[in-house]
Amino acid sequence: MERIVLLLAIVSLVKSDQICIGYHANKSTKQVDTIMEKNVTVTHAQDILERTHNGKLCSLNGVKPLILRDCSVAGWLLGNPMCDEFLNVPEWSYIVEKDNPINSLCYPGDFNDYEELKHLLSSTNHFEKIQIIPRSSWSNHDASSGVSSACPYIGRSSFFRNVVWLIKKDNAYPTIKRSYNNTNQEDLLILWGIHHPNDAAEQTKLYQNPTTYVSVGTSTLNQRSIPEIATRPKVNGQSGRMEFFWTILKPNDAINFESNGNFIAPEYAYKIVKKGDSAIMKSGLAYGNCDTKCQTPVGAINSSMPFHNIHPHTIGECPKYVKSDRLVLATGLRNVPQRKKRGLFGAIAGFIEGGWQGMVDGWYGYHHSNEQGSGYAADKESTQKAIDGITNKVNSIIDKMNTQFKAVGKEFNNLERRVENLNKKMEDGFLDVWTYNVELLVLMENERTLDFHDSNVKNLYDKVRLQLKDNARELGNGCFEFYHKCDNECMESVRNGTYDYPQYSEEARLNREEISGVKLESMGVYQILSIYSTVASSLALAIMIAGLSFWMCSNGSLQCRICI
């Protein structure tokens, strides 16, 4: 009994100093996904997917877009009378066309290689319209009667502003031979056309000659078109059709026209004065009097995030498009606040069960307790190394994904619908693969980040363990219990790696041996007490059984026979 009292006295007098390794925790509810887990709560995370836009068409880096309103590109370039506001346009950053603009080819017909022309506009920022063949120069032909009710203007018949529909004059249509030399330093976009009458009567009525042609030639073009006379249903009140063509005339090159009828001659051409990144966007939005660096058909994006899921077609300095709904990068640690029922310390790195909300100036650090008090201290060196390692994470992901598939909206005419459908399938396939790669990379980076933090905590723990050696014992929860007194100066030496093991080793050895001796003696006492307790319990049980038997025999409840 005296030894038990001695043990209790020693335990009550000795309150060991402790130092613990831990990590930061906060009230964050941000969650990330990793390869192995979903919805992992972390202290810090960065959303890298932009989901919002302003719903407006904006200027791009200070340059307004060319919004064609109810006009198509064809209506603008040919000069549909309902598109007069676009006869002369300033520099544009991109072109906006509605899905089905009502003011296109007012006189029914077709525009050859229309999609290629639109592709050309995707690398053009400014046209300068110049006159190449004046209307007044057609003295042998009627250059004013070529109008149609299909192209009305102020209630009267009119025609495309930038070309001239030549009709016979005085019942004659002399063969046309005209040339134009491009003496400009810029390329020229030139447009012309041919009229396909409804019947032979219309052919001779307009052009006198029953058999006609239109020939056009440059150093790279050799084209001869013949009118196709056929009965057709009326469109916009017209049974005839018009077919338009275009070419790019290089500087110092010449274009030659020859025709004896059905010729729609160019009056104006477009000098391509500025080339650059542009686009034709399909959108019904209006101009929002705003400026942006990134524009989509559904609105402008103003974001520094590396990815977006708003629309695959963009122009400008834009985040990369993915089909994902969520991309969040872990930049902090697993957020596991300490549990009060487990005490202060408790497992990141496999042995610490909770983070410290009290440590706010670092990701990893220490908590100590001694006679002078207790407190937290962040490990600035390991925290800074971790911050440096994670700061460039977003740029790293972008660098790894530098082969993004750029979705380009291509348009195809009715004869190329199969190609269009194939293009869309290929584009969707590329975007699916691109999105999968981004999502996988984010999952892997998140796994790597959390493992990185775990490793840093474990390294900090090992740093302390290697310093203290047998001067302290590991408690198994990230803490060490000193076998010697460790004041604040001693604690600081452990934290900064200058702990003097020999200085404290003798005191630690004596305390360690004393505690071990008390434990051994107490084990002997416990063994004696256990034997005594067992014997006493057995004797008491035997006396109870004997007494019960004697009582039952005396009242006849139990018969006892003794045989000799």
Curated annotation (Swiss-Prot):
GO terms for molecular function: host cell surface receptor binding. Residues 549-564 are cytoplasmic. The chain crosses the membrane at residues 528-548. Residues 1-16 form the signal peptide. It comes from the Viruses. Disulfide bonds join 20-479, 58-290, 71-83, 106-151, 294-318, 486-490. The record marks 342-343 as: Cleavage. GO terms for biological process: clathrin-dependent endocytosis of virus by host cell; fusion of virus membrane with host endosome membrane; fusion of virus membrane with host plasma membrane; viral budding from plasma membrane; virion attachment to host cell. Keywords: Clathrin- and caveolin-independent endocytosis of virus by host, Clathrin-mediated endocytosis of virus by host, Disulfide bond, Fusion of virus membrane with host endosomal membrane, Fusion of virus membrane with host membrane, Glycoprotein, Hemagglutinin, Host cell membrane, Host membrane, Host-virus interaction, Lipoprotein, Membrane, Palmitate, Signal, Transmembrane, Transmembrane helix, Viral attachment to host cell, Viral envelope protein, Viral penetration into host cytoplasm, Virion, Virus endocytosis by host, Virus entry into host cell. It is a single-pass type I membrane protein. Residues 17-527 are extracellular. Palmitoylated. It is found in: Virion membrane; Host apical cell membrane. The keyword rRNA processing does not apply. InterPro entries: Capsid_hemagglutn, Hemagglutn_HA1_a/b_dom_sf, Hemagglutn_influenz_A, Hemagglutn_influenz_A/B. HAMAP family: INFV_HEMA (MF_04072). Binds to sialic acid-containing receptors on the cell surface, bringing about the attachment of the virus particle to the cell. This attachment induces virion internalization of about two third of the virus particles through clathrin-dependent endocytosis and about one third through a clathrin- and caveolin-independent pathway. Plays a major role in the determination of host range restriction and virulence. Class I viral fusion protein. Binds to sialic acid-containing receptors on the cell surface, bringing about the attachment of the virus particle to the cell. This attachment induces virion internalization either through clathrin-dependent endocytosis or through clathrin- and caveolin-independent pathway. Plays a major role in the determination of host range restriction and virulence. Class I viral fusion protein. Responsible for penetration of the virus into the cell cytoplasm by mediating the fusion of the membrane of the endocytosed virus particle with the endosomal membrane. Belongs to the influenza viruses hemagglutinin family. Major glycoprotein, comprises over 80% of the envelope proteins present in virus particle. Homotrimer of disulfide-linked HA1-HA2. This is Hemagglutinin. It comes from Influenza A virus (strain A/Chicken/Scotland/1959 H5N1). The gene is HA.
